[in-house]
C-alpha cells in the first residue's frame, strides 16, 4: 500500500535522519572521515524484496563485534529501518548498503562516542547471468582484516580502477602465486567436475554468495574442495566463477587477456540457473 507514496531516486538514512542521498549531511567529525572507522555490508533488492537480509545483517553485526563497534540498535530494528528506506525509493531494484561507524566526535584514536548507523539505497540491478567477465590480476596489498568488511578499501579501489582502465570487469588479488579473491567479489574454479574455493580466512571474505554457490553444489551433486589454489590452476580451470552480492554466479572468459574456461558449460549452467532462481525466490518471499 505504501508504494504509491515513493518519491526518492536514492534514499539514505543517518542516525535517525532520512532523505535523498545527495542532500544528506553527515557530521564533519564522523570517524569515517578521519580513520575509516566503520564496517559495512551490502545486499540487493528485487522489486522491493530484500535478498538474504538476515545473513547480511548477521555478518554486519559480526564485523562490528570484531572491531569493537557496539551497534546502537538490535538486528531486527536495523532490518525494519532498512525496509523503510527501501520503500522510499521510486524503483524496487536496488543496491542496499548498511554501515556502522565509530560515531562522531573530536579526532582522537580512542572511541568515546555512540556508533553511527548508515543506510543507502540506490537503483542497481544484479548482473546479467549471461555476461562473461574479463579479469586482470594484481598483487594483494591489503591489510590483515580482509575477512571483515571494513571501509578501508583504498587497495580495492586501486585494483578496481586498474581493471576498469583496461576494459576489465574485476581484478584478482594474488599473494604471490596464490589466488585470494577479487577487488569486490569472490572467485572460484571448476576443474574436472569439482568446485575449488579458497577457505574463508583472514585474507578472504566469507562471501554470502559464495556460501550459496557451495550449497548449490551440494544440492546438485557437485563436489567441493575448500583449499587454496594458484593462478596457474585458475588459468587452466574448466570454468572460472565470480560471485558477489550483485553477481550470484557468472563466468570469466579472460584473465590478463588470456582466454580461460569455457570447458564445463553444463555444470556452470546448472549452478547459475539454481542460484538466479533462488535469488528471485528469496526476494519474492521477502516481499510477502
Language-model regions, residue ranges each:
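Short, acidic/charged, Gly/Pro-enriched secondary-structure junctions
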Residues: 76-106
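Helix-start/capping segments and mature chain N-termini
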Residues: 3-84, 109-288
Amino acid at each position: 500500500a505504501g508504494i504509491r507514496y515513493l518519491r526518492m531516486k536514492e534514499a539514505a538514512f543517518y542516525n535517525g535522519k532520512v532523505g535523498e542521498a545527495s542532500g544528506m549531511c553527515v557530521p564533519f567529525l564522523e570517524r569515517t572521515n578521519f580513520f575509516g572507522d566503520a564496517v559495512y555490508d551490502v545486499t540487493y533488492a528485487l522489486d522491493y524484496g530484500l535478498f538474504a537480509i538476515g545473513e547480511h545483517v548477521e555478518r554486519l553485526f559480526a564485523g562490528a563485534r570484531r572491531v569493537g563497534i557496539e551497534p546502537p540498535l538490535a538486528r531486527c530494528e536495523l532490518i525494519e529501518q532498512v525496509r523503510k528506506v527501501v520503500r522510499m525509493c521510486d524503483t524496487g531494484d536496488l543496491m542496499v548498503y548498511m554501515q556502522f561507524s565509530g560515531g562522531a566526535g573530536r579526532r582522537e584514536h580512542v572511541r568515546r562516542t555512540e556508533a553511527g548507523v548508515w543506510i543507502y539505497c540506490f537503483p542497481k540491478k544484479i548482473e546479467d547471468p549471461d555476461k562473461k567477465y574479463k579479469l586482470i590480476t594484481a598483487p594483494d596489498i591489503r591489510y590483515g582484516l580482509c575477512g571483515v568488511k571494513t571501509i578501508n578499501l583504498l587497495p580495492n579501489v586501486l585494483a578496481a580502477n586498474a581493471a576498469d582502465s583496461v576494459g576489465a570487469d574485476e581484478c584478482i588479488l594474488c599473494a604471490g602465486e596464490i589466488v585470494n579473491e577479487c577487488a569486490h567479489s569472490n572467485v572460484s574454479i571448476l576443474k574436472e567436475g569439482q568446485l575449488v574455493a579458497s577457505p574463508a580466512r583472514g585474507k578472504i571474505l566469507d562471501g554470502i554468495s559464495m556460501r550459496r554457490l557451495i550449497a548449490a553444489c551440494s544440492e546438485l551433486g557437485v563436489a567441493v574442495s575448500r583449499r587454496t589454489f594458484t593462478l596457474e590452476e585458475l588459468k587452466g580451470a574448466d570454468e572460472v566463477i565470480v560471485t558477489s552480492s550483485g553477481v550470484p554466479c557468472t563466468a570469466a572468459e579472460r584473465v590478463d587477456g588470456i582466454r580461460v574456461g569455457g570447458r564445463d558449460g553444463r555444470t556452470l549452467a546448472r549452478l547459475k540457473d539454481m542460484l538466479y532462481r533462488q535469488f528471485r525466490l528469496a526476494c519474492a518471499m521477502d516481499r510477502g
